[in-house]
C-alpha cells in the first residue's frame, strides 16, 4: 500500500497534488487480467515519484511467478495510461519481486513514448519516403 506522510503531502504544490490525483485515477483503471481487479485495489503500487513532468512507479505483482504475459501487460498499461495524463511527459516503471522483472522493466521502459515522437502524419503523402 502506498503511504504518504501528511506533512510531505501538505507541502506539495497544488499542481503536484492535482497531478497525483490524476495519476491514481489512471492507475485505478488498470486491471490485473488474471483477477479482474484494479491494481490500486490489490495494493500493487509501492511508490509513485513525481519530478517535474516525469513519473516513476514502483510496483510488485501478485506473485513472483505471476505469468510473465500478465506482468508485462500490467506494467505496459501503467506506462501507457500515465503517458495519457496531461502534465506527464515521461514514465518509468519498475516492477520488483518477479522472476522476469529485469526483462519486463527493460521492455516497458524502452517502449516508444508518443509524446517524444512528435506528431504523426495525417495523410499518406506526408509520410517520409526514407527514414
PLM features: what roles do these ranges have?
Residues 2-131:
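Domain-level signature for proteins that mediate thiol-based redox and metal-cofactor handling
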